[in-house]
């Protein structure tokens, strides 16, 4: 029994040591998390588990569109049941939930413009981009047509259309998507950011910006989220805005954060690595296991 216990503690220490090493390496910049694939082998760029990542994106995008378009559909039919603020909160919360649920699997992009931006700035392999786009548009389309069925006889399923001049809506979409991508790059690609709060940060950015963008452009920030309900509702007014705006916004947001980002001195980076909640927890457990063996 004692031997088995010792073996168990030894295996536990080995596992924790490996996790600490991996996390430290990730935060030091040598290896980066799901969203970042620098120069790697074909097996890393085109992994055997790509299918699971694609399914994760389908599910995450489905739920994103189902919640956001569902809330918008009900608001459009009867604004006494769901308010404009309620729509924004629902959108921000579903983004937060999906990041925590699927971020460790696929990166929880849920947005073709985000995937494109990550690929352009070497945070995602180009070879996987078409698969992610297919997953995102598939999930969005499925959600839109499911909503069309369950919300019948509502004819317009959460479409986003300009409420005024098209250039107003375009400018709003660029600005709000810039904000979302700037925050996303900060928490997803920078080792100094508190990664555990990524979901809250990105979800809050989506919620805050959509509160004022909603009355002007609908606050889409996502080509898949706009195209799917447009097809289901047969409403294509200003559709180009919701492709061009998010693409410009995400690319500019990622570029600006990449430009202002800088690397700290090694000593400072070492201190920053120890601020990770997960790393501290692992190190505490490792120390406790070592104490038990003394």
Swiss-Prot record:
It comes from the Eukaryota. InterPro entries: Aquaporin-like (IPR023271), Aquaporin_transptr (IPR034294), MIP (IPR000425), MIP_CS (IPR022357). SUPFAM superfamilies: Aquaporin-like. The keyword DNA-binding does not apply. It holds the Pfam family MIP. A motif (NPA 2) lies at residues 222-224. It is a multi-pass membrane protein. A motif (NPA 1) lies at residues 111-113. Belongs to the MIP/aquaporin (TC 1.A.8) family. NIP (TC 1.A.8.12) subfamily. Aquaporins facilitate the transport of water and small neutral solutes across cell membranes. This is Aquaporin NIP2-2. It comes from Zea mays. The lineage of its organism: Eukaryota, Viridiplantae, Streptophyta, Embryophyta, Tracheophyta. The gene is NIP2-2.
């Amino acid at each position: 029994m004692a031997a088995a216990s010792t073996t168990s503690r030894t295996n536990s220490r080995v596992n924790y040591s490996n996790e600490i090493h991996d996390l430290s390496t990730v935060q030091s910049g040598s290896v980066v998390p799901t969203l970042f694939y620098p120069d790697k082998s074909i097996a890393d760029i085109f992994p055997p588990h790509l299918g699971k990542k694609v399914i994760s994106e389908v599910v995450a995008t489905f739920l994103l569109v189902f919640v956001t378009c569902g809330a918008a559909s009900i608001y459009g039919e009867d604004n006494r049941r769901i308010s404009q603020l309620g729509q924004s909160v629902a959108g921000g919360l579903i983004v937060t939930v999906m990041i925590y649920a699927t971020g460790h699997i696929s990166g929880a992009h849920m947005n073709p413009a985000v995937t494109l931006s990550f690929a352009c700035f070497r945070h995602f392999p180009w070879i996987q981009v078409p698969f992610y786009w297919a997953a995102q548009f598939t999930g969005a389309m499925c959600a839109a047509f499911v909503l069309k069925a369950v919300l019948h006889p509502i004819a317009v399923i959460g479409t986003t259309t300009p409420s005024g001049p098209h250039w107003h809506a375009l400018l709003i979409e660029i600005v709000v998507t810039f904000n979302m991508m700037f925050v996303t790059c900060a928490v997803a690609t920078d080792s100094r950011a508190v990664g555990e709060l990524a979901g809250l940060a990105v979800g809050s950015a989506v919620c805050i910006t959509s509160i004022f963008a909603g009355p002007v452009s609908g606050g889409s920030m996502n080509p898949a989220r706009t195209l799917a309900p447009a097809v289901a509702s047969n409403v294509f007014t200003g559709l180009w805005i919701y492709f061009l705006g998010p693409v410009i916004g995400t690319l500019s947001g990622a570029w600006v954060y990449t430009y202002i980002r800088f690397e700290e001195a090694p000593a400072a980076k070492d201190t920053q690595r120890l601020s990770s909640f997960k790393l501290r927890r692992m190190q505490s457990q490792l120390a406790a296991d070592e104490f038990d063996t003394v």
